[in-house]
């Protein structure tokens, strides 16, 4: 599986996940508007007043 990942040029770098990493995630700090994207072995979806985290299991779904 591939996911987008944040890098020096923004969050557009595509990476291939390891066999153990079955989730793509998109994590957003709602206060600072910073975001992180990548692969994960486990993932918990969160939507609170200050944090949003989306998990997905298909290629390049964390845009």
Swiss-Prot record:
Expressed by the venom gland. Gene3D superfamilies: CD59 (2.10.60.10). Keywords: Disulfide bond, Neurotoxin, Presynaptic neurotoxin, Secreted, Toxin. Disulfide bonds join 3-24, 6-11, 17-39, 43-55, 56-61. One of its GO terms (molecular function) is toxin activity. InterPro entries: Snake_toxin-like_sf (IPR045860), Toxin/TOLIP (IPR035076). Its main location: secreted. SUPFAM superfamilies: Snake toxin-like. Belongs to the three-finger toxin family. Ancestral subfamily. Orphan group XIX sub-subfamily. This is Bucandin.
